[in-house]
Amino acid sequence: MIARILYFFLWSAAFLPELQCASQRTADALTTFPTSAFINGTDRKDSNQTSTSRIKRKTLSVDFAVPSLLRYYLALFIKRPLNGDCLSFNGCYTVRANLLMRCVPLQKTIAGLLDAKLAAMNVNRSSTGQLPYRQKRPVPKVLNLGLTSASRKSNQVVVEVGEEMVKTGCGGLHVYEDAPVVFLEMDLTRILEWWLGAEGGRLRVRLMPERKVQVPGKEDKYSAAIRASDARLFIQIASSERPSSTISRNPTVAPKYWNFSWIAEDELTFPEDPVSTSDCTSKAKSCDRRPDGYYPEFAWSLTSAEDSWAIDQTMVKTKASSQGWEEGRFLTVNSSALTGPWVLSPWFRAAHRPCGLDITVFLHPRQSGRYTVWLIERDKPPLALLTTEHPHVIGWAVVHLSLAARSKPFRISSSYSQPGEIETATYDPRYSTNCTTRSSQNVTLRGRYHCRGGREINVSQLCDFSIDCPQGDDEGEHCRQFLNGSYCSFGREDCGWQPVQGRGPQWRAHPSIPQSLRSSCPSPGALLAIDSQPKGQRGSAQVRSPLFFYPLRNAPCMVKFWVCGSSNGALSLWITENSTGPEGQRSLWNSTSEANMGKGWKLITLPLFGLVDLFYLQFSADISSSSGIAFAVDNFTLSMECFLETNGEFPPVAPISPTQALFTQSNENIKTTTTLYGGPGASTESVKWIFHTCGATGQDGPTPTQCSNSYRNTNVNVTVGTKGPFKGIQMWQVPETRKYRITAYGAAGGRSVLAVHKSHGVYMTGDFLLQKDELLYILVGQEGEDACPNMVPTMDRICREQQGPSINKTQLKGGGGGGGGGTYVFKVVNGVHIPLLIAAGGGGRGYSSQSETPEEVMDRDPSIPGRNGKSGTAGGGGGWNDSAPVPQGGRPLILGGQGGEPCQAMGWKTRGGFGGGGGACTAGGGGGGYRGGSAWHDNDPRKDGDDGTSYISPDGEMYLEPLKGMEGNGEVIINPVQNCSHCESGDCHETSEGMVCYCDEELTLAPDGVSCINSTELPLLPAQPSLSHLALGLSVGTSALIAALLLAVSGVMIMYRRKHTELQSIQLELQSPDCKLSKLRASTIMTDYNPNYCFGGKTASVNDLKEVPRRNISLTRGLGHGAFGEVYEGLAVGIPGEPSPMQVAVKTLPEVCSEQDELDFLMEALIISKFSHQNIVRCIGVSLQALPHFILLELMAGGDLKSFLRETRPRLEHPSSLTMVDLLNIARDIARGCQYLEENQFIHRDIAARNCLLTCKGPGRVAKIGDFGMARDIYRASYYRKGGRAMLPVKWMPPEAFMEGIFTSKTDTWSFGVLLWEIFSLGYMPYPSRSNQEVLEFVTNGGRMDPPKNCPGPVYRIMTQSWQHQPEDRPNFSTILERIDYCLQDPDVVNVPLPVEYGPIPEEEERVPMRPEDPSAPSLLVSPQGTEDVPSATHSAQSKKDGEAIHMANLSTDSKLPPVPPSQPHPHHHLQTPVVTAPVPASKPSSTTSNAQDGGHVNLGFMQAHSSEKESRNRKPTNLWNPTYGSWFLQQQQKRQQVQAQRQTSGPRIPGEGQEQVGRTVTVAEALGLQQQHKQQQYQQQLQRQQQQQQQQQQQQGLCRPLLPPPPPPAPTPLLLDSATLAPVPLYRLRRFPCGNIGYGYQEQGLPMEPMQGPQLPPPHPGQQRPISLTRASGPEDSRPLLVTMGTVQDSRLPKMEGHNATVL
């Protein structure tokens, strides 16, 4: 326990702003000092400090950024948008995102900043009084983060880290050393889901301290702890891999499986302590570490703290400063039970001047660990600046570091190795530095691909023509379909690569290798090739790629391709960005730089960094007529790193260098192909270092970034100079002392117009003894620039036509080749350059070169001055040590070695290569070397530039003499000299089998592997044995394998046929009406599905439903057909908590239905059962133990709201009892129900008058929400998004719902606004005279409905507020209820009279156009005619009795109507007037005829139609009003008699609400007005009929009293009811209606409706004109869906929707 307390106190010292004592001081000194925020003794924050803190918070946060282009490229790869639409794109995908932070730094930082007394008394008590040692350890929780409206606008999530977050996520503030909580985890899945489907910029996640710690002293430490917590952002997006019922042959179909993950983190890791070699342990002893050849970058000294404070008074002032954070002070503390404590600084910069750093540590002789201070740069491994050995003194020591100026940002890390458990380390937080601070940098984003078999690979291994996944899902068609041309094997197509038209040979995609390349480039497949076998073809042939998208910013993008061809030709790859055009074309690669070009296929990998615009690539082949030249390119790829990875704010860098292997852990998933020097157990015997130009071309050398990228995944680690004479020179540190073999290759000279061959550079090899840590300087020569091909059209024409030099004197200033640069290997000792090995560069070729190849020249005497070559019009080559030459001359190495300029800027950009190459004119430029080559003085086009001279130091031993043979850029190869003393020749080389001795020519290695013998002395080899037995074995094995495969295939086919037959029989059995689906039993449902859903935070399942025994339920009469089956009125007894008997409405599910119908039926029961509100229809119980299944609902005698509003409209002859207060009360009831749903986070999605029910029609009525048909499918997926081809109520939906499929509680707000419009228009259809398509365009363009007639202004304002375009601008239902209450209290609102209806009665509004037998024939709207009798001999008696007539369409005088069979008996009587259909020829134009004598008012704005209750040909009922109770018809004998009497006495009626058409409304209006006498008679009849109806309703309903059971029958009714005790009910209808096949007021195109059974039609009277009402031949809109997507899908399980409110999305 004492050790724990001591450990805590010492750690507290690392966090507190003041530390005045060591661990051995008294307890008085252990009290903490006040922070800088409370120096003045008050808790009030200074406004200036707060303002400063807010500014600094921007620089102290950790910043994660996910580029928006990543979202685009991922969607392009998977061939589907990332919008959560699961139905349109063959399945969903899963998303996961979380943020991890280490808990220990956060816990210790926050605990150290709490109240000092509490911290001293309770060790680690939190601010809330938590005692971690005495109470049970809290359980850490995963924190869920959401998006605010501000975050949605900025695509930025700000995570404020504070005390409460750490307590919750880490389980308290105490660190349990035995089992610490490692990570604080935050779930960002919802944020990622939103961002993937949204638009806008990148997703940004920023970590910063919470606002209440804005005191500068506290905020600094919080920010430091956040940085030290090593935050990491994990993202994973994967396909759900759901099986598809159909197999698509479309190649552009999205891949079935894909799984990507990313991790965003700072790649810097903190190293372990190496074995220290420092011996500076004495007090006040100064030590300097200055390796040979290094500029002193740092120095450090170790002094006592007392002496330092006594001398430096500024540090004392810093200690007492009250400014909190200052430039020059930092502290970041992190600790782990596994790795020990360490501190980390922010990013610093010392760009212009050196800076210093003071670190205070506590030393004790008993410490076995060591303090180590590291210098960390992003592009380099951590460098140990100092390491303390076992100290011999006790006390505080100040370590002072002096850092040289550095161009790149860096950090300082100090760590302490902790061998023992009781080891402690103490740091004084008073670090001081004058280095400039930098803000935190963005982190990198690295991607991984998860194979189907579970293996993970890097993104770079995806789509690279190399199968790395076990099942091969990392390659294939989805890679080829990603970006055209980026993944091409030139097999089936050219992938968009097009040849550039020109003379000479052309690039072509060949199905097989050309004849000229078959011997050297064997290939079984197709490829892109060029062949110049026909004589006389010469010039340049280009092939160009498609235009590629630019990669992500700072992406590690690579281009890879395989190439094979002739060694005497030239193939190059160029890149052109769209913004620069052909003038900015850059060369990426040239085949002349590749060794062994003509010896098989070679894989070329090139970096593509820094691209910010669209670009294309171009292969260019230079063809001469001297010999046949052929090239082939295959398997071209752009790495997926280009589009799925980014390096953050930094350009791509080389991987961790070999020396850093001491500090970082190895990754088993990274495959290496070379053995890196510097790791544990590594040996230099087999290591080879290859240095090249890093991709640089021309007269200037490479940059550090180029070399970092070029040496990626290699064992080469160099530093590249950026200033002065060392610019472009590579510096390499010798790993150990031994003899090395150095091979230097000079660069070749450039080609001229007529000379197609380069002047070769010189290569030579020497052995040198090098010392460990010695710095070797390497300048790799670059080839001189070629005159051809040329980007200038005029010059390029000269190149193609091979013109001579005398055509134009102004163009003679050029055409020669630039001189090649020499390759230099040298050392710098005490500022003096010492050459070791110099390989000369080749001279440039003259315009029409006729020079002979010169011999190699080498210098060995260092006393010979290394002068520049002589320059004429063309420049001479640069030497070793000379003065500055003319501009066209190459510069000597001492001055930088840059190449010379061309003689004149006439478009001949033939500069000398880096390494002293001379610039060309008509004559060639001189080559670089120890002594530069001279150029011809009179610019003779026939003269080449001279080669430079080579050199080897006397300290070296020549191994290979100079030889001209390099036809490209230079190169340097360094490898350790092998110990070949055991070989007779003294020479050997290493192979995979070990060391192999060399032998001279005509000698052969003896069998002993050591000596060399004459090849003629070798004994004859014994004859090889016959291979007949091997061939026989192979043939037998092959035959057996083929036979096994045939048997296996046959077995599979037989099993498949058997299974197919069984499936067919099962399907036939399932389709049989006598089949009882056993899966629909309750036990099977629970086993297969067991649906569990969440309602308002509560989990619900089928077990929660109240089961009512079937014997307690009796059905009395039918109410109609619902969404699943018949709906009945019944009685239920024995239900706990309910009256007995109780009137209920029973919804049934037929026995023969699908599993999905069963699940939908249970879903609706679950939804309704979990709601308990006075304005929502109550579920009494269910009966699932027997078939058919029942749902028992409370009986609503008032019917649906829409029908009630239509029936009670005030009319001129019949005033209504409704008032404005009644309408407001109905609206308030529905709003209360919606508020309840909103509070329980439930989305109804279909708030409309047809889905609301009334308890009664008289006063005291209560409105309730009664249909949840559209709400039940929101629980089948994880997203509140309606997708696929579903029927949607467009006129009740906001724009985001029908455009994007997004449903929220604000969707119901919009629908409630439309419901208000329905209520105050008294049941009219919204958006009058507009079709669904017109409504889509109208609402999307900002249009809204006008207020209904006599609608009060405050009510219309509620509507308009509910119709706001932005969902967040719409009010919630609490606000809507308040506004409705205000309206009820406003006299100006409640006293507004209702509008008077002048149209027809509701029964006549419900007429529906019936479809004829011919689908192309127009539908007829049929209405009754009571007063006008049409004479006909074919009328039936029933037709005459009912007094009905038919309004016929006068389309043609020759049209004849076929007879219709008489009406069939129906088990239920309906209130609808019988209608008939008649086919009408569709070829004739529709015409309209108005009858002025009929009179009446035609409301063209609100024309409606409803289907009849009959069944159509496909067994789909054509009239369904409300799916909760079905069709509301009441078998009231008095009302039927009244209707019959009305038909006999009423006059002709014209429908008041017509039919909306698809695309546009075609209505036929009758003439307005009747004769006055006929009108008065009609009014009187209607008034009498209305009075009779009022009396009957009052007698039947009274004042809306509670529902009571009907009078008992004469026989006594038993308490336990049974269906047998009541009158028989036609229950056969439960089997007649198949589950789910319910029509919704429409028919599919081409499926005519069943003709209605009615009286036979009479022939038209000659000359008689009849009123007509026509619709289009294609059918009304309610008889077919509006097609938004191609194809028509009618879902039989969708909820019923009335009128024209359905569309297919």
Swiss-Prot record:
Compositionally skewed regions (Low complexity) per UniProt: 1532-1544, 1588-1602
Tissue: Highly expressed in the developing central nervous system: highly expressed in brain, with much lower expression in heart, caudal fin and testis.
Transmembrane feature ranges: 1036-1056
Domain Protein kinase: 1113-1389
Cellular-component GO terms for this entry: plasma membrane
EC id: 2.7.10.1
Keywords of the record: ATP-binding, Cell membrane, Disulfide bond, Glycoprotein, Kinase, Membrane, Nucleotide-binding, Receptor, Signal, Transferase, Transmembrane, Transmembrane helix, Tyrosine-protein kinase
Regulation of its function: Inhibited by ALK inhibitor TAE684.
Disulfide bond positions: C694-C707, C788-C799, C903-C921, C980-C988, C983-C997
Annotated GO biological process: cell surface receptor protein tyrosine kinase signaling pathway; positive regulation of MAPK cascade; positive regulation of neurogenesis
Signal peptide as annotated in the record: 1-21
Reactions the enzyme catalyzes: L-tyrosyl-[protein] + ATP = O-phospho-L-tyrosyl-[protein] + ADP + H(+)
Composition bias, Pro residues: 1603-1613
Active-site residues (renumbered): D1246
Ranges facing Extracellular side: 22-1035
Segments on the Cytoplasmic side according to the record's topology features: 1057-1705
Record domain MAM: where: 486-644
Similarity comment: Belongs to the protein kinase superfamily. Tyr protein kinase family. Insulin receptor subfamily.
PANTHER family xref list: ALK TYROSINE KINASE RECEPTOR, TYROSINE-PROTEIN KINASE RECEPTOR
Name this polypeptide is given: ALK tyrosine kinase receptor
